[in-house]
Amino acid sequence: MLSRKSSNWLLNVPSQSEATTSVNLQSTEVGSITHTSSDDNIATPQDGIDHIDNDRSSSRAENIDMTASMVSHSRSLASLRPVMSSNFQNESDHIDDSLEFDLMRSLNESIYSTDGAISKPFMINEMPQIFDKNSNEDITKNFFIFTSAGKPVYSMYENDKFSASYIGLLTSIISFFQTSNEDNIKTFTSKESNITFVFCNKDPIFYVAMSRCRDESRDELEAQLHFLHSFVLSTLTSKQLTKLFQKRDNFDLRSHLESTDFETLSEICSNFTDKLYPEFSLNSLQCLKLKKPIRAKIHSIMSSQLNKMEDFPRGTLLYSFIIASNNRLCNVLRPKSHTLHPVDLQILFLVIATQFHNLESDKELWIPICFPKFNSNGYLYCYIRTIMNPGDKSSSKFLGHPPVLVAISGQKDAFFKMKSYCDELMVILTRNNEIIRELRTSILQPYSITDIPAPLVHHFIFKSSKHIQFTMPQLSTSASEPEQRALYERKLKFYYKSLQNSIAQEIASQSNKSLVNFVQWSEPAKSNSEETTDHDSFIEEPVNMLGMVWCSPRFELLLLFNNGIVTRKQALSSARRIVRWCVSNESSLFINEGATF
């Protein structure tokens, strides 16, 4: 997770005349630029955005802390590695770069318009293949959940014949360390198989992650195990777990879990392993892009409807949400002094997605959920239904992806009150054609990278630190088959994880600094004699991907550029355009306060 303290700092980035990028296929360095603001050089983050491409004096360049960090090399990624270092260049290099920039501008003129103005970014719909043909045939990652008595609870690969053996071995290892050292084992790595095991002791339940992925640290795996524990607590409170195992040490926890609970566990593990899931790595929520007046109108309707419910004792309704497809938050009604933790909401969204996957859209649910960050010893009760019924004329407008309406109460017997509130709210919303039309457009036609004038950008993720929410364009892939789309998500996941890992140490040690870091991945083109994967039209294209991460007190930006030659000056210019676009569209991209009572 990338987090910054709230403060204003001016980001100083050297101009192209001061610093450039050199690529060495044998190198594994990542160039990073950090700067700490002094009292005589403080400006708003917007000022830093506006002047990011300005030339700096030599004295200013001396204040720039140029650092490099090593990035591990993974053989499972076809020898793909980050290769970038930062250095200063002389005046002749600046002339060459100016010529290169002029040539690039001429090329832009020939592609886009006669006057050289770039109205739409040039982008490709695919990224080059980065995985070995057989890299996904073996299990590269697994999660185990079992009790202190060695009773299995869950394994990511339930049919894996080695799961029972693994759990028995892991239980023995844990017991040995507890007996010999009176301490808990945290992690170990097998040298022969290069498998890392990370342990999380939440007695009476143990969680273990097994991973061959070199780009995952122990802290990342441990955080994933903590999230799994949070989900288990959402089904059985901490008090209930303690009571169950006090009665019987060898209690079988699986008997208290529903089939949908195991489905949700599998979905969580899949998100951690194969899917692009920024919600977890950024510790935030994705918000549906919606016009500010429409969102405000929905919030007003939610508040006014609550005020009309005369038979509602104070505190009956705690929270209400409207959630769009793909776990995108649309609207929220909450108390003025309270809000739910992102982890609690992520669990809620995952539960909703799993529950409605097996139900018809006109069904309603009444589910007890423990939100561990809110209160790990008690339940809240969630009334959940879709806003549209299949019989409604407006339902077909969402093409099977209607938004979901959630009402949360602390009272176990408040079902009919929650139902009454949601029914009345749904009637008002469905009668408003403008709201339905805008919701449909936002849900079914999310914005893409082509809507932002940022040349050569393939994809980005922008997190607003103030809102604890992020936004990203729809995935830029033409893959129609699930397998190809899954491969595309794995590529994005690998690149974004590498970007975040490249600044993890700097973020932890330099909390008062803004940071820009570049990572470049390079690999020679495959020869004709090498094996290639089927259905991959870019297999012969050499990998030359540039990524950028920009952290400031106000935002975090993860950015991937098209495969090919992209200079750092072009990258900074496009990054600035994206930040400006996100800031100027903040009211439609993020929820500020929501409706409060």
From Swiss-Prot:
- Biased-composition ranges, Basic and acidic residues, are 48-62
Question: Which biological processes are named by the entry's GO terms?
Answer: cytoplasm to vacuole targeting by the Cvt pathway; late endosome to vacuole transport via multivesicular body sorting pathway; macroautophagy; protein targeting to vacuolar membrane; vesicle docking
Top-level division of the source organism's lineage: Eukaryota
Q: Which InterPro entries match?
A: FUZ/MON1/HPS1_longin_1, FUZ/MON1/HPS1_longin_2, FUZ/MON1/HPS1_longin_3, Mon1
Q: Name one GO cellular component term.
A: cytosol
Comp. bias regions, Polar residues? 33-44
GO molecular function (one): phosphatidylinositol-3-phosphate binding
Query: Where is this protein localized, as stated in its record?
Result: Endosome, Multivesicular body membrane; Prevacuolar compartment membrane; Vacuole membrane
Q: Name one Pfam family in it.
A: Fuz_longin_1
Q: Does the keyword Iron apply?
A: no
Region entry Disordered: which residue ranges?
33-62
Give the membrane topology, semicolon-separated if more than one.
Peripheral membrane protein
| Keywords tagged on the record | Autophagy, Endosome, Membrane, Protein transport, Transport, Vacuole
Report the sequence similarity comment from the record: Belongs to the MON1/SAND family.
Its biological purpose is as follows:
In complex with CCZ1, is required for multiple vacuole delivery pathways including the cytoplasm to vacuole transport (Cvt), autophagy, pexophagy and endocytosis. The MON1-CCZ1 complex acts at the fusion of vesicles with the vacuole, through its regulation of the SNARE complex during the coordinated priming and docking stages of fusion, and particularly at the stage of tethering/docking.
What is the name listed in the Swiss-Prot or TrEMBL entry for this protein? Vacuolar fusion protein MON1
